[in-house]
Amino acid sequence: MIRLIASDIDGTLVPDGAPSINPEYYEVITALQQKGIIFCPCSGRSYQSMHTLFAPIADSLYFISENGTILRTEEKILYTWPVPQEYIRPLVEEGRKLPGISVMICAPDKTYCECGEDGALYRLMHDDYHYNIENIPDVLAVPFDQILKVSLFHNDDQIEEVCKPLTDSEWSTKVQMLCAGTKWLECVALNAGKGEAFALLQELLEIPQEETVYFGDNMNDISAFSEAGASATVSSARSEIREAADIVAHSVKHDGVLRELKRILEVAPDHI
């Protein structure tokens, strides 16, 4: 019996950076909820971006945002996992040294960049992802007390190669550095992640792990796979993820997750 479903967004429910989702997801998720099954989007996106994507049903969802560093509902923040304050300045400064990298820092209610409003990063986050984002001269001018994530962006899809000097350094023992797609390296607290947030949600809802499913397509989803009763991915996912998953659905282009949700709906009892 399945009582809780969580899913990554980009590369799993929608193509990377898509500003909208197949509206049939709203219908199927609502039908699952009517049978007592809870749905939780789980993404590297900000809460504001996720809320926009799921606007017609957002008031009925849990949200795991910013790569597992904040768990909330529409009404209330339930938990946050901020980056240790002493790491933020040196981490940003290291990111600035890397060729072609733009730095972005993420707080619970706002995101900050320093690339200019005509820069590729700002335009992507503002126009496509619908972030509440502000361009400022220096992201280090923002208070450090609730920084959830430091993100490094490379517009030419070479994030792993460009950031290798950072990921191979001592920084790997201070923060988690997770690749999300081919443009992003997400730096979060060591005790943060999608898996940690998904596990806490299960605890708060008193739902055992074996009654959960998690859908994801990238390396930042691996921690959530280990916290799920069943792990699922799409055929367009990275090979490492396909090998780790219990279920491989059709590609994101062919709404593989939507098909799996319909299968779950078909076999679910009328109400849990």
Where are these regions (language model features)?
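Mg2+-dependent phosphoryl-transfer enzymes with acidic/Ser/Thr/Gly-rich catalytic loops
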Residues: 1-4, 22, 186-272
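Non-catalytic pre-domain segments flanking phosphatase-related domains
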Residues: 1-7, 30, 34
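Asp-based phosphoryl-transfer active-site loop
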Residues: 3-18, 225
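Active-site metal-binding loops of divalent metal-dependent hydrolases
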Residues: 9, 68, 217-218
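A structural signal for hydrophobic residues in beta-strands of small regulatory alpha/beta folds
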Residues: 13, 79, 248-249
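Active-site phosphate-binding/coordination module
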Residues: 20-122
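Short, structured coil segments at secondary-structure junctions
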Residues: 56-59, 67, 171-173, 227-228, ...
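Conserved acidic, metal-coordinating active-site core of Asp-based
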Residues: 94, 100-215, 219-224
